[in-house]
Swiss-Prot record:
Keywords: Cytoplasm, Methyltransferase, RNA-binding, S-adenosyl-L-methionine, Transferase, tRNA processing, tRNA-binding. Its EC number is 2.1.1.213. GO terms for biological process: tRNA methylation. Residues 57-165 form the THUMP domain. It catalyses: guanosine(10) in tRNA + 2 S-adenosyl-L-methionine = N(2)-dimethylguanosine(10) in tRNA + 2 S-adenosyl-L-homocysteine + 2 H(+). It comes from Methanocaldococcus jannaschii (strain ATCC 43067 / DSM 2661 / JAL-1 / JCM 10045 / NBRC 100440) (Methanococcus jannaschii). This is tRNA (guanine(10)-N2)-dimethyltransferase. It is an enzyme of class 2 (transferase). One of its GO terms (molecular function) is tRNA (guanine(10)-N2)-dimethyltransferase activity. One of its GO terms (cellular component) is cytoplasm. Its main location: cytoplasm. PANTHER family: THUMP DOMAIN-CONTAINING, TRNA (GUANINE(6)-N2)-METHYLTRANSFERASE THUMP3. Catalyzes the adenosylmethionine-dependent methylation of the exocyclic amino group (N(2)) of guanosine at position 10 of various tRNAs. Acts via a two-step process that leads to the formation of either N(2)-monomethyl (m(2)G) or N(2)-dimethylguanosine (m(2)(2)G).
Amino acid sequence: MIGYVLNGEHEEIPYGELMALLEIFNYNGSVERLKRYVITEDSPAKDIVKRSGYIDEGHRIIFRYNLEEKSVDLVDKIVNDFINSFKDFVANIDYPDIDESKSYAVRVLKLHKDEFTKSIDSLRIEKEIGGIIKLKTNAKVNLTKPDILVRVVILENTFFISNVLEMRDREYFQKNRPHLRKYFHPGCMLPKLARAMVNLARVKEGDIVLDPFCGTGGFLIEAGLIGAKLIGCDIDWRMASGTLINLEEYNLLDKVIKVKRLDAKYVKEFLNELNIEKVDAIVTDPPYGISTAKKGEIEKILETLPEVIKDNGYFVFAYPKKIELDMELEGLYKVYIHKGLIRHIHVYKKI
């Protein structure tokens, strides 16, 4: 079994992104969600976590322990029973991934916070579970840079012991924030959310992705890194030019079909010039801080864009309110930005 740790910044986007990625990688097995921990059968955890914006870790689940009782007064007994159950389980198996040639460390991750889980002694669990693994495998303990990180995941009514297969690249999202790019304009979406929106659009390598309000190119960067072919436009020539500057910085110009200055209401004609009838996905974030009349124009453009999307393709966009389109709404997520702005992330599928 495989376990996924969902990021806690948003209640639903991480799960929606995971379900999209499971679909992208053609997974058809069972899915069990325990709030921020999701269990599947043998799904490609490394590929999914590497590509994700909001999936923190992918695990190979070794042991599952369901609590029969739960009380702060009984916490020592419950932890003892858990440790002894794991010891009995390990006695009858070859512990996966770890042997005397590998180093390991055990770390507790509490994904549920209440008085009971707060009272659990993480250090004790790490020490005792680590000792059991040591006796079984004769592997070396390395607390700073282990070959294998063993996670003890503590949920509301369930404990898991898992080997970490992959961790999300937090450094990428820190080092690639919009203000650190060669061309920057205020109001850009953070790359973590941009990556998640590209994933929600089920973008695959070789797909044609369009951003008709491309701004500084955030969505096109994330789609290009996946291997998609890129089309972008913006009514502001500085933005279109800045997008190309940023795509060049990421060595993605070879993925570009065309980026140009263009009013998005002429996208259909733009695609015709490129001999492209329809695209696989549109991912975009139209401008918000504009007059009521301009907002009306943008909403009309949003209503016409499904015409250039292939059947079964996706239209994923952010807007300050819910927009009804003649497509299948598969997801709607609210992202609080500040007092005056809540982004509504729409995930539409063309049926």
